[in-house]
């Protein structure tokens, strides 16, 4: 266990019960005034670097409802990637990308001492601002703007006066991303070794946030103000997702200060569609990442606060969400973004039987004044089911040393420039190959982790580190010179597979039969050819692609590259032409790119049935 030296700074703690006050969050009816007492916590023998403004670990003491509270904070070292970038635009439209220094940032997460279920997300840039959970209840804290005073207000969000408007909701109306099979826990599933390894591996979401022009105007045309707000939001996201073994690294922030790059409209489905296409066409070509979220201050139609594609993580167009900056309290905006990202990760809206130990959970369809940062049992199981079935690969990859937004910080579990390894804090590290205090290898060690590292030594050259996953994949071998398994290699695209029923595409063999089984269950088969003629209609039941929200009919030769038609073979169903359709994710149920659509032909990415040699 990490030993700490406690250096007390003498600041009295005088709780004061107030009746009403105007704070950044609005008019608060019930609050306490506290004077946090700082207790600096450093590992025994550690010395704070003179150029370091913000310590890696801090403690604060104050009282809530007359009871002492000890707030334990650690710098959120996963917040940024090493080459974190910010993009804005010059008056003549030129792209300006910078890499601001973010090594010594002031964003922390933590917990309350002696409260196992507690958590905290705090900005310590100018006093303490953020939230903490104490005994199952969520409190907000922010400094009072008084001269020469350390006074802070502590209050519950439910005590902030609300504007007279309908509660904000998520725009997703039907969230099933695949068949309505009963959800089972991992212990109930017959998982393959590959699925079990995938499920137990930590996940890393490399995130880019885009702030639109109306956000730029809302915050006084200040890039710094927008940056600060988004940093605080991502800090909260990290606390929320850490319980799922998911780490969120901010790779980039883009601000549309010279006008929007898409039409940001009140109609959420149109805006999300345009944003996803812009991400695939433009943003991904400039900045490789896993997920993008658009933050806007436009009023969406109705009480909608956001919208996200369901079960879409890692998809170049659909791994995206849009969120309204609907509240002064950044905690509430972070909850909305966590909710939409939850949809990207396969989670549906909570139903009445779902529970998280609080009055409202992350995936509730309505944002509540009693909102919590907890995922319900339903969300956890749906997320697990999505991971097992889809195994999105991009989130397995740690951010590269050259990708992580913040320069190297030892102890954040991310190996960054200048580090050999990173096993967490000295208190948490259990890796004998890595010195947790220095993030350097221990004497005699060649490596600390990786598929080609065994007991601190490189595995012998030729050792299989990634077995072939099917006939379109190949086994990858250790080189004997590195702890990392080489880049995943596949059979060439277009090679026949599955007894000539398909063609290899990016290591898989996409065939319609398997896609129907995934959507409708084990008894499903591909529908008769005549059903695919519906794809010439150009409506939700059949089309090939969308342009500016309009569904484009398939040309006669392309009908097998549009909507997938199946038959579930269940006795109660007589319709031989069945499709999977959900308005919130119309892409679900389309024929997968690379699927065979005729002899020597495969579906291209723009849903045309072309010669297999040109399809990829």
UniProtKB/Swiss-Prot annotation:
Its main location: secreted. Keywords: Apoptosis, Calcium, Cell adhesion impairing toxin, Disulfide bond, Fibrinogenolytic toxin, Glycoprotein, Hemostasis impairing toxin, Hydrolase, Metal-binding, Metalloprotease, Protease, Pyrrolidone carboxylic acid, Secreted, Signal, Toxin, Zinc, Zymogen. Residues 21-194 form a propeptide. It holds the Pfam family Disintegrin. This is Zinc metalloproteinase-disintegrin-like VLAIP-A. Binds 1 zinc ion per subunit. Heterodimer; disulfide-linked. Glycans are attached at residue 377. Expressed by the venom gland. Residues 203-399 form the Peptidase M12B domain. SMART domains: ACR, DISIN. Belongs to the venom metalloproteinase (M12B) family. P-III subfamily. P-IIIc sub-subfamily. Inhibited by EDTA or 1,10-phenanthroline. Not inhibited by PMSF. Residues 407-493 form the Disintegrin domain. The active site is at 340. PROSITE patterns: ADAM_MEPRO, DISINTEGRIN_1, DISINTEGRIN_2, ZINC_PROTEASE. Ca(2+) binds at residues 409, 412, 414, 416, 419, 422. Its EC number is 3.4.24.-. A motif (D/ECD-tripeptide) lies at residues 471-473. Residues 1-20 form the signal peptide. It is found in: Secreted. The N-terminus is blocked. Snake venom zinc metalloprotease that hydrolyzes the alpha-chain (FGA) and more slowly the beta-chain (FGB) of fibrinogen, without affecting the gamma-chain. Cleaves alpha-chain of fibrinogen at '432-Lys-|-Leu-433' and '535-Pro-|-Met-536' bonds. Induces apoptosis in vascular endothelial cells and inhibits endothelial cell adhesion to extracellular matrix proteins such as fibrinogen, fibronectin, vitronectin, collagen I, and collagen IV. Also hydrolyzes azocasein, and insulin B-chain (at the '38-Ala-|-Leu-39' bond). Negative results: does not cleave fibrin. It comes from Macrovipera lebetinus. The modification Pyrrolidone carboxylic acid is found at residue 195. GO terms for biological process: apoptotic process; proteolysis.
């Amino acid at each position: 266990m990490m030993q700490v030296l406690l250096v007390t700074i003498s600041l009295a703690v005088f709780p004061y019960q107030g009746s009403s006050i105007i704070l950044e969050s609005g008019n608060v009816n019930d609050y306490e005034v506290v004077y946090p007492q700082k207790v600096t916590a450093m590992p025994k023998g550690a010395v704070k670097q003179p150029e370091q403004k913000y310590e890696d670990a801090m403690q604060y003491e104050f009282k809530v409802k007359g009871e002492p509270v000890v707030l334990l904070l650690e710098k959120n070292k996963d917040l940024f990637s090493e080459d974190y970038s910010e993009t804005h635009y010059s008056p003549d439209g030129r792209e300006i990308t910078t890499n601001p220094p973010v090594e010594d940032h002031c964003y922390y997460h933590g917990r309350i001492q002696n409260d196992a279920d507690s958590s905290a997300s705090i900005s310590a840039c100018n006093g303490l601002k953020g939230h903490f959970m104490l005994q199952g209840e969520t409190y907000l804290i922010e400094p009072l703007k008084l001269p020469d005073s350390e006074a802070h207000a502590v209050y519950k969000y439910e005590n902030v006066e609300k504007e007279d408007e309908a509660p904000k909701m998520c725009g997703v109306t039907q969230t099933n991303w695949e068949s309505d099979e009963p959800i089972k826990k991992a212990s109930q599933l017959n998982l393959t070794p590959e699925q079990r390894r995938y499920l137990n591996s930590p996940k890393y979401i490399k995130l880019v946030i885009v702030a639109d022009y109306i956000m730029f105007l809302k915050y006084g045309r200040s890039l710094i103000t927008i940056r600060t707000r988004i940093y605080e939001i991502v800090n909260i996201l990290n606390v929320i997702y850490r319980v799922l073994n998911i780490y969120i690294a901010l790779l980039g922030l883009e601000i549309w200060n010279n006008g929007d790059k898409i039409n940001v409209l009140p109609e959420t489905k149109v805006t999300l569609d345009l944003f996803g296409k812009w991400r695939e066409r433009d943003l991904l070509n400039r900045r490789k990442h896993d997920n993008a979220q658009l933050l806007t201050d436009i009023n969406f139609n109705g009480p909608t606060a956001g919208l996200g594609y369901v079960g879409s993580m890692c998809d170049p167009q659909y791994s995206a969400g849009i969120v309204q900056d609907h509240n002064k309290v950044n905690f509430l905006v972070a909850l909305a973004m966590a909710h939409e990202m939850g949809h990207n990760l396969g989670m549906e809206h909570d139903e009445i039987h779902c529970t998280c130990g609080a009055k409202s959970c992350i995936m509730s369809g309505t944002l509540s004044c009693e909102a919590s940062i907890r995922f319900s049992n339903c969300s956890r199981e749906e997320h697990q089911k999505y991971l097992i079935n889809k195994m999105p690969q991009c989130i397995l990859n740690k951010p590269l040393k050259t990708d992580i937004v913040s320069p190297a910080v030892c102890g954040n579990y991310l190996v960054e420039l200048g580090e050999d390894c990173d096993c967490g804090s000295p208190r948490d590290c259990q890796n004998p190959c890595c010195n947790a205090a220095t993030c350097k290898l221990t004497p005699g060690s060649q490596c600390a982790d990786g598929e080609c590292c065994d007991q601190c030594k490189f595995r012998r050259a030729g050792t299989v580190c990634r077995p072939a996953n099917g006939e379109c994949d190949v086994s990858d071998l250790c080189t004997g010179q590195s702890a990392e398994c080489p880049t995943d290699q596949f059979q060439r695209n277009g090679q026949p597979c599955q007894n000539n029923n398909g063609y290899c595409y990016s290591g898989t063999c996409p065939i319609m039969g398997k896609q129907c089984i995934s959507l409708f269950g084990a008894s499903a088969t591909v529908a008769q050819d005549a059903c695919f003629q519906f794809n010439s209609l150009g409506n939700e039941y059949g089309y090939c692609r969308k342009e500016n929200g309009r569904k484009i009919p398939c040309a006669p030769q392309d009908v097998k590259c549009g909507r997938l038609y199946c038959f579930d073979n269940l006795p109660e169903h007589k319709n031989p032409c069945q499709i999977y359709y959900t308005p919130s994710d119309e892409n679900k149920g389309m024929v997968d790119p690379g699927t065979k659509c005729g002899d020597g032909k495969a579906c291209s990415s723009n849903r045309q049935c072309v010669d297999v040699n040109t399809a990829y």
